[in-house]
Amino acid sequence: VTSDTQPKEQPEEQPEKQPILRAPAVVLVLLAALIVFHLLSVFGGNAMRIELIVALGLFPARFFAEGLGGLPGTWVQGVVTLFSHSMLHGGWTHLILNSVWLLAFGAPVARRLGPRKFMFLYMVCVMFGGLGQILITDFSGYLIPIIGASGGVAGLMGAAARFAFSDVRWLDPNAQEPRRRLLRLSEVPRRRPVVIFIAVWLIINLSFGLLGPYGLADPSGAAVNVAWVAHLGGFFAGLLLIGLLEKPPLSASGGPGHVDYGDWKNRK
């Protein structure tokens, strides 16, 4: 009689993938808000659309033109529109594209940061995107409103680039699933997948910036072109900011979660 004393290998458990329809509530609420504002601008009539654009759109004139370029409100409203312009879109294509990318990149970032830090990251990226766009706008474009969530969505892409291409290193105690290590900024240019992702994103963004029909809109609702600098400002804001918002957890070995156990042990 013989017996097999060798332990049988147990199949590795694969982490459950998170479908888009199970995106965190904060992402779905944000998406719903974008849709509601667009429905108001589309079905509320031309007068309401103009009113929304004047009230919420980001006009460079509110920052640089004498007398706010004749626009109503004060400079305070100009500051508010650095954020509120993200709620409006130039058309259904503009909204759908931003919605798809919001779900694709916003969901993993929201799971990682939680709702409050996610919204803070998103809105700061919206702001930096808007600032970048108005700073490169010349006098002839002062009264052309900048609208769209593209700066915030681009920021989520930049944030995701810091962890989407790293190795699975530790178990997230909250989600009970493997979590990818956040790359240090110094590692980003040394990771080929990250560099390729950023390079492809830049090429596509610049191409649409030169040729694309959406991103800016005049008061009549006609789209003009892509606010490509807003994309750049948001993307790189997200790439940098996520490292300030995420607190590295401790690994099971007691070392910081941003390094392998061997690395941590050797650094003690």
Label every PLM stretch briefly.
Residues 2-268:
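A detector for small-residue-rich transmembrane helices and their helix-helix packing motifs
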